Amino acid sequence: MDKKPPLTLYLAAPRGFCAGVDRAIKIVEMALQKWGAPVYVRHEIVHNKFVVDSLRDKGAVFVEELDDVPSDRPVIFSAHGVPKAVPAEARRREMVFVDATCPLVSKVHVEAERHHAEGLQMVMIGHAGHPEVLGTMGQLPEGEVLLVETVEDVARIEPRDPGRLAFITQTTLSVDDTAAIVAALQARFPGIRGPAKEDICYATTNRQASVKAIAGRIDALLVIGAPNSSNSRRLVEVGSAAGCAYSQLVMRADQIDWRAIAGARAVGVTAGASAPEVLVDEVVAAFHARYDLTVEMVETARENVEFKVPRVLREA
């Protein structure tokens, strides 16, 4: 039998589920226990196929619009948040609904409303079309939120009154890219108001920091996550920017391109905030099967954040 080549696997920590994702999944599971199947979920509860498929197997039905939900069945709004019009329509139809919006996203919604109440126009740093961005922009009347994705976009926006602006950000952005966009906004609009610190959440920040911590030791980085997961895609970009010659997103172990990492002697592994640890275990097992493996954990922070589920699910 051929001798396995040696390889060190660096597991970044923190990785995987954040408190908002954990809460959202619990909400669907508790709703199924409380009301029985089917329970409808507007949009994927979190952006991970493995999670969505497992909840679907338990009786969750995933739809994109409220129109697809029968009025007599409960509906859950995804962790990414929804425009104000969605719960308003659910109330009009007298539907039972549970909002699984991450509390850190809801905090951004509150910021936007507070600035709007003071007569400020909002600038949102985020990715066009992402559900979180659609939900946050949908908290205010049309035209009240200007979206910028890049430093170049800052030069293109035309606010109503350049002296009456505030900015907010999507919670799952690249920390470094966002800092550059904020600097561009402050240079063009010196009076622009913003949060005490950017709205990028603790989990996004921590996962990016852990990738940077291992980047100098590895030949390749694998990020476990879904293609539609914003925070997972940012981790791939952070890895590349930190000097990883090969930085790749994989949903599961069967997507690993073994030829692409054939020459590697050290590989980093992390997981996006909506990827369960079972998928990390699967990847580690796949490396064990091919290599004489040494596994090292590199921990840059400890997370103990926990969010309560809504009261309606805690009541008997």
Swiss-Prot record:
Active site: 132
Cofactor(s) the protein needs: [4Fe-4S] cluster
Sites where the protein binds dimethylallyl diphosphate: 47, 80, 130, 229-231, 274
Keywords assigned by UniProt, alphabetized: 4Fe-4S, Iron, Iron-sulfur, Isoprene biosynthesis, Metal-binding, Oxidoreductase
Binding site for [4Fe-4S] cluster: 18, 102, 201
Enzyme class: oxidoreductase
Cited InterPro entries: LytB/IspH
Chain positions recorded as (2E)-4-hydroxy-3-methylbut-2-enyl diphosphate binding sites: 47, 80, 130, 171, 229-231, 274
Pfam families on file: LYTB (PF02401)
One GO MF term: 4-hydroxy-3-methylbut-2-enyl diphosphate reductase activity
GO biological process annotation, one example: terpenoid biosynthetic process
Gene3D superfamilies reported for this sequence: 3.40.50.11270, 4-hydroxy-3-methylbut-2-enyl diphosphate reductase, catalytic domain
Protein family (similarity comment): Belongs to the IspH family.
Chain's role: Catalyzes the conversion of 1-hydroxy-2-methyl-2-(E)-butenyl 4-diphosphate (HMBPP) into a mixture of isopentenyl diphosphate (IPP) and dimethylallyl diphosphate (DMAPP). Acts in the terminal step of the DOXP/MEP pathway for isoprenoid precursor biosynthesis.
UniProt-recorded name of the protein: 4-hydroxy-3-methylbut-2-enyl diphosphate reductase
Species annotation: Paracoccus denitrificans (strain Pd 1222)
